[in-house]
Protein backbone atom coordinates (compact mmCIF):
# COMPACT_ATOMS: atom_id res chain seq x y z
CA UNK A 1 0.00 0.00 0.00
CA UNK A 2 1.27 3.45 -0.80
CA UNK A 3 1.53 6.36 1.52
CA UNK A 4 2.57 9.95 2.00
CA UNK A 5 5.43 11.03 4.17
CA UNK A 6 4.69 14.61 4.89
CA UNK A 7 2.37 16.99 6.68
CA UNK A 8 1.46 20.62 7.10
CA UNK A 9 3.14 23.27 5.01
CA UNK A 10 4.84 25.81 7.28
CA UNK A 11 2.68 24.71 10.22
CA UNK A 12 4.10 23.90 13.62
CA UNK A 13 2.37 22.44 16.63
CA UNK A 14 2.71 24.32 19.88
CA UNK A 15 4.98 22.88 22.52
CA UNK A 16 1.94 21.89 24.55
CA UNK A 17 0.11 18.68 23.63
CA UNK A 18 -2.76 18.99 21.14
CA UNK A 19 -6.32 19.33 22.30
CA UNK A 20 -7.54 16.14 23.88
CA UNK A 21 -4.08 14.79 24.64
CA UNK A 22 -2.78 13.92 28.01
CA UNK A 23 0.64 15.06 29.08
CA UNK A 24 3.96 15.31 27.33
CA UNK A 25 4.08 11.66 26.33
CA UNK A 26 7.61 10.32 26.66
CA UNK A 27 8.74 7.10 25.07
CA UNK A 28 8.10 3.82 26.78
CA UNK A 29 11.17 1.65 27.03
CA UNK A 30 9.16 -1.54 27.47
CA UNK A 31 5.93 -2.88 26.07
CA UNK A 32 2.72 -3.17 28.01
CA UNK A 33 2.47 -6.78 26.85
CA UNK A 34 3.67 -9.72 28.87
CA UNK A 35 6.51 -10.63 26.57
CA UNK A 36 8.72 -9.26 23.82
CA UNK A 37 7.56 -11.94 21.41
CA UNK A 38 3.96 -10.85 21.90
CA UNK A 39 4.69 -7.19 21.33
CA UNK A 40 6.70 -7.46 18.13
CA UNK A 41 5.41 -9.45 15.24
CA UNK A 42 8.75 -9.19 13.48
CA UNK A 43 8.91 -8.64 9.77
CA UNK A 44 5.52 -7.65 8.36
CA UNK A 45 4.12 -9.00 5.17
CA UNK A 46 3.83 -6.00 2.88
CA UNK A 47 0.54 -5.27 1.18
CA UNK A 48 -0.30 -5.61 -2.45
CA UNK A 49 1.11 -3.20 -4.98
CA UNK A 50 -0.77 -0.35 -6.48
CA UNK A 51 -2.00 1.89 -3.65
CA UNK A 52 -0.01 5.10 -3.34
CA UNK A 53 0.41 7.12 -0.19
CA UNK A 54 1.52 10.70 0.14
CA UNK A 55 3.53 10.53 3.37
CA UNK A 56 0.60 11.58 5.47
CA UNK A 57 -1.12 8.31 5.00
CA UNK A 58 -3.30 10.07 2.48
CA UNK A 59 -4.07 8.51 -0.86
CA UNK A 60 -2.35 10.18 -3.76
CA UNK A 61 -3.24 10.39 -7.40
CA UNK A 62 -2.45 7.38 -9.54
CA UNK A 63 -0.23 7.05 -12.53
CA UNK A 64 2.95 5.41 -13.62
CA UNK A 65 5.99 6.29 -15.59
CA UNK A 66 6.94 5.79 -19.17
CA UNK A 67 9.23 3.12 -20.40
CA UNK A 68 12.27 3.61 -22.24
CA UNK A 69 15.49 3.68 -24.07
CA UNK A 70 18.57 5.65 -23.23
CA UNK A 71 18.30 9.35 -22.51
CA UNK A 72 21.11 11.86 -22.48
CA UNK A 73 20.03 14.99 -20.65
CA UNK A 74 20.60 17.32 -23.57
CA UNK A 75 19.34 16.79 -27.11
CA UNK A 76 22.24 14.70 -28.49
CA UNK A 77 22.25 12.97 -31.82
CA UNK A 78 20.14 9.87 -31.78
CA UNK A 79 18.11 10.76 -28.71
CA UNK A 80 14.53 10.11 -29.61
CA UNK A 81 11.65 12.23 -28.47
CA UNK A 82 8.58 11.19 -26.61
CA UNK A 83 8.79 9.17 -23.46
CA UNK A 84 7.79 10.17 -19.97
CA UNK A 85 5.26 9.17 -17.42
CA UNK A 86 1.91 10.41 -16.38
CA UNK A 87 0.96 14.03 -15.96
CA UNK A 88 -2.03 15.82 -14.64
CA UNK A 89 -3.35 16.48 -11.20
CA UNK A 90 -3.94 14.03 -8.41
CA UNK A 91 -7.13 12.27 -7.67
CA UNK A 92 -9.06 12.55 -4.45
CA UNK A 93 -8.75 10.10 -1.62
CA UNK A 94 -10.64 6.91 -2.02
CA UNK A 95 -10.86 3.31 -0.87
CA UNK A 96 -8.73 1.85 1.82
CA UNK A 97 -10.07 4.35 4.32
CA UNK A 98 -7.10 6.69 4.00
CA UNK A 99 -7.63 10.42 3.90
CA UNK A 100 -5.40 13.10 2.45
CA UNK A 101 -4.70 16.02 4.73
CA UNK A 102 -2.69 19.24 4.50
CA UNK A 103 0.97 18.36 4.01
CA UNK A 104 3.61 18.29 6.71
CA UNK A 105 7.28 18.84 6.04
CA UNK A 106 9.07 15.55 5.24
CA UNK A 107 12.66 16.09 6.25
CA UNK A 108 15.42 17.10 3.94
CA UNK A 109 17.76 14.40 5.12
CA UNK A 110 21.50 14.50 4.58
CA UNK A 111 22.61 16.94 1.90
CA UNK A 112 25.83 16.14 0.09
CA UNK A 113 28.57 18.75 0.16
CA UNK A 114 30.40 17.07 -2.72
CA UNK A 115 29.56 14.03 -4.81
CA UNK A 116 32.70 12.29 -3.58
CA UNK A 117 31.56 12.71 0.02
CA UNK A 118 28.10 11.29 -0.57
CA UNK A 119 26.71 9.72 2.57
CA UNK A 120 23.32 8.35 3.38
CA UNK A 121 21.16 9.28 6.33
CA UNK A 122 19.89 6.33 8.33
CA UNK A 123 18.15 6.68 11.71
CA UNK A 124 19.17 3.14 12.52
CA UNK A 125 22.86 3.54 11.80
CA UNK A 126 23.75 4.88 15.25
CA UNK A 127 22.41 1.78 16.95
CA UNK A 128 23.61 -0.76 14.40
CA UNK A 129 26.13 -3.40 15.33
CA UNK A 130 29.52 -3.49 13.59
CA UNK A 131 28.33 -6.44 11.55
CA UNK A 132 25.17 -4.76 10.26
CA UNK A 133 24.51 -4.76 6.55
CA UNK A 134 25.80 -2.09 4.22
CA UNK A 135 23.52 0.82 3.35
CA UNK A 136 21.56 0.25 0.16
CA UNK A 137 20.43 3.79 -0.65
CA UNK A 138 22.87 5.76 -2.81
CA UNK A 139 23.41 9.10 -4.53
CA UNK A 140 22.98 7.33 -7.87
CA UNK A 141 19.36 6.61 -6.95
CA UNK A 142 18.68 10.33 -6.54
CA UNK A 143 20.52 11.01 -9.80
CA UNK A 144 18.33 8.44 -11.53
CA UNK A 145 15.22 10.21 -10.20
CA UNK A 146 16.50 13.52 -11.59
CA UNK A 147 17.26 11.77 -14.91
CA UNK A 148 13.72 10.39 -15.10
CA UNK A 149 12.11 13.73 -14.28
CA UNK A 150 14.33 15.69 -16.66
CA UNK A 151 13.68 13.34 -19.57
CA UNK A 152 9.94 13.47 -18.92
CA UNK A 153 9.79 17.26 -18.74
CA UNK A 154 11.84 17.69 -21.93
CA UNK A 155 10.18 14.87 -23.86
CA UNK A 156 13.25 12.65 -24.18
CA UNK A 157 13.24 8.88 -23.98
CA UNK A 158 13.45 7.64 -20.42
CA UNK A 159 16.88 6.52 -19.12
CA UNK A 160 17.92 2.91 -19.45
CA UNK A 161 17.94 0.50 -16.57
CA UNK A 162 20.32 1.85 -13.89
CA UNK A 163 23.29 -0.04 -12.47
CA UNK A 164 22.41 0.08 -8.77
CA UNK A 165 20.72 -2.87 -7.07
CA UNK A 166 17.23 -3.89 -8.14
CA UNK A 167 16.23 -5.47 -4.83
CA UNK A 168 12.61 -4.90 -3.74
CA UNK A 169 11.97 -2.29 -1.05
CA UNK A 170 9.09 -0.16 0.16
CA UNK A 171 10.12 3.33 -0.92
CA UNK A 172 9.31 7.03 -1.00
CA UNK A 173 10.44 9.78 -3.35
CA UNK A 174 10.32 13.30 -1.89
CA UNK A 175 10.82 16.61 -3.70
CA UNK A 176 11.57 19.90 -1.97
CA UNK A 177 12.20 23.26 -3.56
CA UNK A 178 13.97 26.54 -2.82
CA UNK A 179 16.37 27.69 -0.14
CA UNK A 180 13.83 27.02 2.57
CA UNK A 181 13.27 23.51 1.15
CA UNK A 182 9.51 23.67 0.93
CA UNK A 183 7.74 20.40 0.28
CA UNK A 184 6.92 20.01 -3.42
CA UNK A 185 5.79 16.40 -3.59
CA UNK A 186 6.09 13.19 -1.59
CA UNK A 187 4.55 9.85 -2.51
CA UNK A 188 5.65 6.30 -1.90
CA UNK A 189 4.52 2.75 -1.28
CA UNK A 190 4.64 0.24 1.57
CA UNK A 191 4.61 -2.56 -0.97
CA UNK A 192 8.10 -3.83 -1.74
CA UNK A 193 8.93 -2.84 -5.34
CA UNK A 194 12.02 -3.54 -7.41
CA UNK A 195 14.04 -0.34 -7.14
CA UNK A 196 14.50 0.25 -10.87
CA UNK A 197 10.79 0.30 -11.68
CA UNK A 198 9.74 1.64 -8.27
CA UNK A 199 11.96 4.72 -8.39
CA UNK A 200 11.04 5.36 -12.01
CA UNK A 201 7.33 5.23 -11.19
CA UNK A 202 7.34 7.19 -7.95
CA UNK A 203 9.68 9.86 -9.30
CA UNK A 204 6.96 10.91 -11.72
CA UNK A 205 4.05 10.17 -9.40
CA UNK A 206 5.47 12.37 -6.63
CA UNK A 207 6.51 15.12 -9.05
CA UNK A 208 3.36 15.22 -11.16
CA UNK A 209 0.49 13.60 -9.27
CA UNK A 210 0.70 14.64 -5.63
CA UNK A 211 -2.79 16.10 -5.37
CA UNK A 212 -1.62 18.76 -2.92
CA UNK A 213 0.49 20.47 -5.61
CA UNK A 214 0.37 21.30 -9.32
CA UNK A 215 2.57 19.17 -11.62
CA UNK A 216 6.21 20.23 -11.70
CA UNK A 217 7.57 22.32 -14.57
CA UNK A 218 10.96 22.71 -16.24
CA UNK A 219 11.54 26.06 -14.57
CA UNK A 220 11.54 24.42 -11.13
CA UNK A 221 14.33 21.92 -11.85
CA UNK A 222 17.31 24.07 -10.74
CA UNK A 223 15.75 24.66 -7.30
CA UNK A 224 14.79 21.07 -6.53
CA UNK A 225 16.05 18.65 -3.90
CA UNK A 226 15.34 14.95 -4.37
CA UNK A 227 15.22 12.45 -1.50
CA UNK A 228 14.96 8.68 -1.79
CA UNK A 229 13.85 6.77 1.33
CA UNK A 230 14.00 2.97 1.53
CA UNK A 231 11.89 1.54 4.37
CA UNK A 232 13.13 -1.36 6.48
CA UNK A 233 12.65 -3.21 9.79
CA UNK A 234 8.85 -3.20 10.04
CA UNK A 235 7.67 -4.27 13.50
CA UNK A 236 4.23 -4.48 15.09
CA UNK A 237 4.23 -3.16 18.67
CA UNK A 238 1.59 -3.38 21.39
CA UNK A 239 2.31 -0.04 23.06
CA UNK A 240 1.61 3.04 20.93
CA UNK A 241 4.55 4.77 22.68
CA UNK A 242 7.01 1.99 21.81
CA UNK A 243 8.98 3.89 19.16
CA UNK A 244 11.74 6.51 19.15
CA UNK A 245 11.37 10.04 17.77
CA UNK A 246 13.87 10.63 14.97
CA UNK A 247 14.61 6.92 14.61
CA UNK A 248 11.33 5.24 13.70
CA UNK A 249 8.67 6.02 11.19
CA UNK A 250 5.22 4.99 12.34
CA UNK A 251 2.14 3.70 10.62
CA UNK A 252 -1.12 3.55 12.56
CA UNK A 253 -4.42 1.77 12.00
CA UNK A 254 -7.53 2.82 13.90
CA UNK A 255 -11.31 2.79 13.77
CA UNK A 256 -12.78 6.26 13.38
CA UNK A 257 -15.92 7.66 14.96
CA UNK A 258 -18.00 6.29 12.06
CA UNK A 259 -16.69 2.76 12.50
CA UNK A 260 -14.40 2.84 9.45
CA UNK A 261 -10.85 1.52 9.46
CA UNK A 262 -8.29 4.24 8.70
CA UNK A 263 -4.50 4.30 8.34
CA UNK A 264 -1.86 7.03 8.30
CA UNK A 265 1.94 7.25 8.38
CA UNK A 266 4.83 9.61 9.09
CA UNK A 267 8.37 8.93 7.90
CA UNK A 268 11.07 8.86 10.62
CA UNK A 269 12.19 12.46 10.17
CA UNK A 270 8.77 14.15 10.44
CA UNK A 271 8.29 14.17 14.22
CA UNK A 272 11.84 15.34 14.88
CA UNK A 273 11.65 18.15 12.33
CA UNK A 274 8.35 19.37 13.75
CA UNK A 275 9.61 19.22 17.34
CA UNK A 276 6.86 16.82 18.43
CA UNK A 277 6.86 14.31 21.25
CA UNK A 278 5.14 10.92 21.04
CA UNK A 279 1.66 12.14 21.99
CA UNK A 280 1.76 15.12 19.65
CA UNK A 281 2.89 12.91 16.78
CA UNK A 282 0.18 10.31 17.38
CA UNK A 283 -2.52 12.97 17.72
CA UNK A 284 -1.37 14.77 14.57
CA UNK A 285 -1.36 11.48 12.68
CA UNK A 286 -4.88 10.68 13.88
CA UNK A 287 -6.09 14.04 12.59
CA UNK A 288 -4.30 13.52 9.30
CA UNK A 289 -6.01 10.13 9.05
CA UNK A 290 -9.38 11.85 9.39
CA UNK A 291 -10.22 11.23 13.05
CA UNK A 292 -12.41 14.13 14.20
CA UNK A 293 -13.61 13.09 17.66
CA UNK A 294 -11.84 14.12 20.89
CA UNK A 295 -8.63 12.15 21.36
CA UNK A 296 -8.40 10.41 24.73
CA UNK A 297 -5.69 8.23 26.20
CA UNK A 298 -8.13 5.32 26.13
CA UNK A 299 -8.59 5.77 22.39
CA UNK A 300 -4.84 5.98 21.78
CA UNK A 301 -4.47 2.57 23.42
CA UNK A 302 -6.74 1.06 20.74
CA UNK A 303 -4.38 2.10 17.92
CA UNK A 304 -2.50 -0.62 16.06
CA UNK A 305 0.99 0.77 15.49
CA UNK A 306 3.75 -0.45 13.21
CA UNK A 307 7.18 1.10 13.52
CA UNK A 308 9.84 1.04 10.83
CA UNK A 309 13.17 2.58 9.90
CA UNK A 310 14.51 4.07 6.71
CA UNK A 311 17.66 4.73 4.75
CA UNK A 312 17.55 8.16 3.15
CA UNK A 313 19.65 10.03 0.60
CA UNK A 314 19.09 13.64 -0.52
CA UNK A 315 20.63 15.39 -3.50
CA UNK A 316 20.17 18.96 -4.74
CA UNK A 317 19.98 19.71 -8.45
CA UNK A 318 23.41 21.40 -8.28
CA UNK A 319 24.86 18.28 -6.65
CA UNK A 320 23.18 16.16 -9.29
CA UNK A 321 24.92 18.14 -12.06
CA UNK A 322 28.25 17.87 -10.23
CA UNK A 323 27.75 14.14 -9.80
CA UNK A 324 27.06 13.75 -13.50
CA UNK A 325 30.28 15.65 -14.32
CA UNK A 326 32.22 13.02 -12.38
CA UNK A 327 30.22 10.13 -13.84
CA UNK A 328 30.08 10.66 -17.59
CA UNK A 329 28.49 7.30 -18.24
CA UNK A 330 25.15 6.57 -16.63
CA UNK A 331 22.94 3.56 -17.25
CA UNK A 332 25.47 2.20 -19.74
CA UNK A 333 25.42 5.15 -22.14
CA UNK A 334 27.11 8.51 -22.52
CA UNK A 335 25.30 11.06 -20.43
CA UNK A 336 26.00 14.69 -21.44
CA UNK A 337 24.97 17.33 -18.94
CA UNK A 338 21.99 19.52 -19.79
CA UNK A 339 22.88 22.96 -21.16
CA UNK A 340 23.25 25.44 -18.32
CA UNK A 341 21.45 28.14 -20.30
CA UNK A 342 18.26 26.13 -19.82
CA UNK A 343 18.33 27.18 -16.18
CA UNK A 344 19.77 30.68 -16.23
Curated annotation (Swiss-Prot):
**Cysteine disulfide partners in this protein:** none
Q: Where is the AMMECR1 domain?
A: 130-324
**A Pfam family this chain is assigned to:** AMMECR1
InterPro entries under this entry?
Answer: AMMECR1, AMMECR1_dom_sf, AMMECR1_domain, AMMECR1_N
Q: Which domain of life is it from?
A: Eukaryota
Keywords from UniProt, A to Z, are: Nucleus, Phosphoprotein
Q: What is its main location?
A: nucleus
Entry GO terms, CC? mitochondrion; nucleoplasm; nucleus
- Biased-composition ranges, Low complexity, are 28-37
Q: Where in the cell is it found?
A: Nucleus
Region Disordered, as annotated, extends over 1-39
Residues found modified as Phosphoserine = 16
Q: What is this protein called?
A: Nuclear protein AMMECR1
The gene for this chain is Ammecr1
Amino acid sequence: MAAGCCGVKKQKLSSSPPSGSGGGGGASSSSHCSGESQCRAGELGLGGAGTRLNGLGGLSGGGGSGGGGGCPLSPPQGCGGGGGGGGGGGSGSGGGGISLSPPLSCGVGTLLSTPAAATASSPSSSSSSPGSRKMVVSAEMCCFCFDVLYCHLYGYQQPRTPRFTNEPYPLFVTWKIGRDKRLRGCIGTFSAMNLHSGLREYTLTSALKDSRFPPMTRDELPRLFCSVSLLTNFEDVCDYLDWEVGVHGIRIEFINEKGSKRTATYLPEVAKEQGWDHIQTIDSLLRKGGYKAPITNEFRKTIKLTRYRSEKMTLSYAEYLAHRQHHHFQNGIGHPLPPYNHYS
